From Swiss-Prot:
Residue numbers of Sulfotyrosine PTMs: Y87
Signal peptide: 1-21
Gene Ontology molecular function: any one: hormone activity
Name the UniProt record assigns to this protein: Gastrin
Length: 104
């Protein structure tokens, strides 16, 4: 009996996870047809009427892709430092040119 309950529970959870995207089809279609910049200039209460979007998705819709790309371009992560350390030894051509410029 416990095994049957476990199977039913797993099946219900899997079904709920697979059908999560299909329980809001109206908002998905409206969002796709409106385009990325269509929510620009709308009031927050108007955005609430459009559908149950997440806070993050609303921010992306209001901000627009060009701003998002610019913000991501400004950020530098720790991987930049790792690349400098890993490939710094291969940068001998630039370093020797800089050393040549410093000598009188």
């Amino acid at each position: 009996m416990q095994r049957l309950c476990a199977y039913v529970l797993i099946h219900v959870l899997a079904l709920a996870a697979c059908s999560e995207a299909s329980w809001k089809p109206g908002f998905q279609l409206q969002d796709a047809s409106s385009g990325p910049g269509a929510n620009r200039g709308k009031e927050p209460h108007e955005l609430d009427r459009l559908g149950p979007a997440s806070h993050h998705r609303r921010q992306l819709g209001l901000q627009g892709p060009p701003h998002l790309v610019a913000d991501l371009a400004k950020k530098q992560g720790p991987w930049m430092e790792e690349e400098e350390e890993a490939y710094g030894w291969m940068d001998f051509g630039r370093r020797s040119a800089e050393e040549g410029d410093q000598r009188p």
